[in-house]
Regions:
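Extended, compositionally biased accessory segments flanking or bridging domains
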Residues: 93-136
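Hydrophobic protein-protein interaction segments
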Residues: 118-473
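Cationic-aromatic interfacial patches
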Residues: 2, 13, 31, 221, ...
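Charge-biased C-terminal accessory regions appended to nucleic-acid-, cytoskeletal NTPase
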Residues: 459-512
Length: 512
């Protein structure tokens, strides 16, 4: 969990680290009075004045500080300008879309061993020991929403997932000062089958238990292979530091009560319960068709969305896919017909609705699609699209970008990778994240993070327009030019393929 300091505090820390005095800095910067820098250190100056000071500081003493120290000062300055809550939310959303990654410091756990001696271990190794020899682990989490912790939690669970039954219930406070960074912090675990998260709304939570939900705590109840059971609670003391306490059965009364609250709170992801894969996929696409209808949509994704593939291209390929799976035409045709109707409705909605659609794509991923005919989330039973089909798909995007005033297409700059998967905001309805490579295979317990909290939706929309579109993407004109270049590559591949086919025919005639 990374610390956020005001500019005055950050500057004082940097001066202490570099053993520079305020007097020395004032002299080197030729400031009229030492009082000016003392006012900055006391936090009595505006962000604008602090910005001018920092630029002058860098100009005259740039070599005195490390890159990390300059970065910390700039972050502190930005936080002062926009406020701590908005800054933390913005940084969290930058992490969500893959445009920013803070260094993660390993967490540690302090505990008493069997002899009562104080011990210290890394958070990751402590969990690995906890899971070793376990048959079943039930975990109850309150707060602790941090990317570093959750990456380590994922790393601890992954090796034992096949032999240990793990269930994690996580209660997350949904206050506006925490909700955005909290939901980003849990992303490493949100698509894991064992993980179940709930948003705790103060209005729907018993007041006597609300304080409990806001603590930083992880409780693990372990059933061991020898038949014994044990429970340990980790309490977050401060930055990246837990203390561990062994709990008795009597201590678990609050845990049992909070589990009863699960029905009060909204889960933050979709879970596709499978009865039949094909019919469930129809329900899945129907839900998206309904969510897209009449909504402004803000996409970030690697390449062409499934729903933007023209029906005349997609459904011959779908039929081929079902046939290759061994299904008869009589078996698959009802599903194909139902999917075709929904897909056409989605295409029509995209082209005709008078609400804006923004889509930011990754150029390298689009180039890969042109080369291979395969999307990052290619439907798992489909063959790759041919060069001709690829051109037809891109032609739809070009036509929309040229002629539809409500359709806005961008290519991301390098600082926005767009390779982690899809992040899609359906304005006022939901913010959905999905990892690349799922193939929409619902048999694999397909999951997507689905956030409906109004504050998060508003914060993400503002972030998308003010940061993603304004600062992290090429202009629409530049992006359209790049898209048209990809179309020309498809045309070249088609011509080269035709020449190759003509050459093969000539060889056959010569052989005769």
């Amino acid at each position: 969990m990374n610390e956020h300091l005001a500019f005055a505090q950050c500057l004082q820390r940097v001066l202490n680290e570099t053993e520079l005095t305020a007097t020395e800095v004032a002299r080197r910067l030729e400031m009229r009075s030492r009082n000016s820098i003392f006012r900055i250190l006391k936090g009595k100056t505006s962000p604008q004045l602090n910005r001018r000071f920092l630029e002058n500081f860098h100009k005259h003493m740039g070599e005195q500080l490390t890159e990390a120290q300059w970065a910390a000062l700039n972050r502190a300055l930005e936080m002062d300008a926009v406020g701590a809550v908005e800054y933390k939310s913005r940084q969290a959303l930058m992490q969500l879309v893959g445009a920013f990654s803070e260094p993660i410091s390993p967490a540690k756990v302090c505990y008493l061993d069997a002899l009562g001696a104080e011990k210290e271990d890394s958070f990751l190794h402590y969990l690995q020991v906890l899971f070793c020899g376990a048959l079943k682990v039930n975990a109850l989490l309150f707060g602790c929403c941090d990317l570093g912790l959750f990456r380590q939690l994922q790393e601890a669970i992954h090796p034992v997932a096949q032999r240990v039954i793990v269930r994690i219930d996580h209660f997350i406070y949904a206050g506006e000062d925490e909700i955005v960074s909290n939901l980003v912090g849990i992303q490493p675990m949100v698509d894991q089958p064992c993980y179940h998260a709930y948003l705790v709304d103060a209005e729907n939570c018993p007041q006597e238990r609300l304080a409990h939900y806001r603590t930083g705590q992880m409780t693990f109840h372990v059933m061991h292979q020898d038949g014994s059971e044990s429970t340990v609670a980790l309490f977050l003391l401060g930055k990246n530091e837990f203390t561990a306490t062994v709990m008795s059965t009597q201590d678990l009364w609050m845990s049992r009560k909070v589990l009863c609250d699960r029905e009060r709170f909204s889960p933050i992801r979709l879970l596709w319960q499978l009865n039949d894969e094909n019919s469930d996929f129809i329900v899945y696409t129907q839900q998206y068709c309904k969510m897209e209808h009449g909504a402004a949509i803000y996409y970030i994704r690697p390449d062409v969305p499934f729903q933007y593939i023209p029906l005349e291209v997609l459904y011959p390929v779908v039929r081929e896919g079902f046939a290759r799976m061994g299904m008869t035409r009589e078996a698959y045709e009802p599903n194909v017909t139902a999917l075709a109707e929904i897909h056409q409705a989605r295409m029509t909605n995209m082209m005709r609705r008078r609400r804006p659609t923004y889509i930011v794509l990754n150029k390298a991923a689009m180039e890969e699609f042109v080369r291979t005919g395969r999307q990052s989330d290619h439907l798992h039973f489909l063959r790759n699209f041919t060069p001709k089909e690829r051109k037809q798909i891109l032609d739809v995007l070009v036509q929309q970008a040229r002629k539809n005033p409500f359709f806005h297409l961008y290519f991301a700059q390098e600082k926005l990778p767009c390779t982690m998967g899809e992040v899609a905001l359906y304005d006022g309805r939901a913010l959905i994240t999905m990892s690349s490579g799922s193939g929409y295979d619902l048999r694999t317990d397909h999951r997507e993070s689905c956030i409906t909290h109004p504050f998060v939706l508003r914060a993400y929309k503002q972030f998308y327009m003010n940061t993603v579109v304004a600062r992290l993407a090429d202009t629409q004109t530049e992006s359209l030019n790049q898209l048209e270049e990809l179309v020309r590559r498809c045309e070249k591949m088609i011509r080269e393929g035709q020449k190759g086919n003509a050459g093969n025919e000539q060889e056959k005639l010569s052989g005769q």
